[in-house]
């Protein structure tokens, strides 16, 4: 039996992959499905192919295939294509365009005048990379779809109880999990997909250096509701991203804008959930200056958690009876069904971990 601890994007996707392959699976989640205590909630996460690293460009292609596989299995649309823009005084789009070209990813390099004609509601003053395959992932619907299909494929789900004990048996061939409601679950393999809660678990293995931060996101109403906004990556004095909000922004069309960095160090257990007013001021100022198609005062805001490694790569590795499938360093949502497949492969002995995702990698 394989136990999966954590039913966020990674854990839910792993349980779905394992169950659809016919394995005996128990999924354990401390909170409700879709809870707000981690990193996997909300209606809007960016999917993009544009990375300044050929490794991740290739990986996004594999992830796109897995998204369509999940949508087909769940009969639920989860990834909405919008196109995406990369720009900013510190984001040279030309090297990224070269990587996309090498991977046969459709894209355009645009002068500011041409880009401004196409997206007049964005103030564009430099070169822009556009790639049409970018889009928006609904995290809430994805988690719900994965859990539902995992159960329909035969998985057991234990929801609303925390794992309080993890003991490797003397033979090292089984792991005993204890939960706060008194259950004892014996598994041959345990997939840990706890995200920001990972450092709180008492695991018999060494974890890499991790930083948990509280991030803030803000939703700004569109001045013209009929405009179709792309996703945005902006690197300059500020490092921001933007994308259509979905239901998180309320009943009228909104765009989510947030800083990718400048999070506040915290832990999953001690986070305040209080939005940082200095971040609100910076992001609102950016919207006022660069996104004239949005009203500059946010109509909704929220916090979430990043769990980041030193090199900002993921951790997807096996150590004895454990598979560690988190953290995702603030850019893992777009890869969720692919990471689930990787973790399932490790849990069943079908593959070796990628060197960049190993627990003991340098850095």
Tell where the protein language model's regions lie, with residue ranges.
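Glycine-rich Rossmann-fold phosphate-binding loop(s) that bind the pyrophosphate
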Residues: 6-10
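C-terminal catalytic lobe of FAD-dependent flavoproteins
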Residues: 286-363
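Glycine-rich FAD pyrophosphate-binding loop
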Residues: 19-40
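Active-site substrate-recognition segment that forms the wall
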Residues: 16-20, 77-79, 196-320
């Amino acid at each position: 039996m394989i136990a999966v601890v954590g039913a966020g994007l990674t854990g839910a996707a792993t349980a779905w992959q394992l169950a659809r392959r016919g394995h005996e699976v128990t999924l354990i989640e401390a909170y409700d499905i879709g809870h707000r205590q981690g990193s996997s909630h909300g209606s809007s996460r960016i999917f993009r192919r544009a990375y300044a690293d050929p490794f991740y460009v290739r990986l996004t292609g594999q992830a796109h295939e897995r998204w369509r596989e999940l949508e087909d299995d769940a009969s639920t649309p989860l990834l909405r294509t919008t196109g995406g823009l990369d720009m900013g005084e510190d984001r040279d789009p030309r090297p990224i365009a070269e990587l996309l070209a090498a991977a046969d990813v459709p894209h355009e390099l645009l002068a500011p005048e041409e880009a401004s004609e196409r997206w007049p509601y964005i103030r564009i003053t430099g070169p822009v990379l556009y790639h049409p395959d970018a889009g928006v992932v609904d995290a809430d619907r994805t988690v719900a779809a994965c859990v539902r299909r995992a159960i329909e494929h035969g998985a057991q789900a234990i929801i609303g109880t925390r794992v309080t004990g993890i003991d490797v048996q003397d033979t090292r061939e089984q792991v005993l999990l204890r939960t706060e409601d008194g259950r004892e679950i014996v598994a041959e393999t345990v997939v840990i997909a706890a995200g920001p809660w990972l450092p709180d678990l008492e695991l018999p293995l060494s974890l890499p250096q991790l930083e948990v931060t509280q991030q803030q996101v803000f939703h700004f109403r569109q001045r013209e509701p009929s405009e179709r906004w792309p996703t945005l990556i902006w690197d300059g004095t500020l490092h921001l991203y933007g994308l259509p909000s979905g239901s998180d922004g309320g009943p009228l069309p909104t765009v989510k804008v947030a800083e990718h960095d400048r999070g506040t160090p915290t832990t999953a257990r001690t986070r305040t959930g209080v939005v940082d007013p200095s971040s609100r001021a910076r992001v609102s100022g950016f919207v006022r200056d660069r996104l004239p198609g949005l009203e500059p005062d946010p109509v909704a805001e929220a916090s979430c958690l990043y769990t980041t490694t030193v090199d900002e790569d993921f951790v997807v590795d096996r150590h004895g009876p454990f598979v560690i499938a988190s953290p995702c360093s603030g850019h893992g949502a777009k890869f969720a069904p692919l990471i689930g497949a990787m973790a399932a492969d490790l849990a069943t002995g079908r593959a070796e971990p990628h060197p960049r995702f190993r627990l003991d990698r340098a850095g």
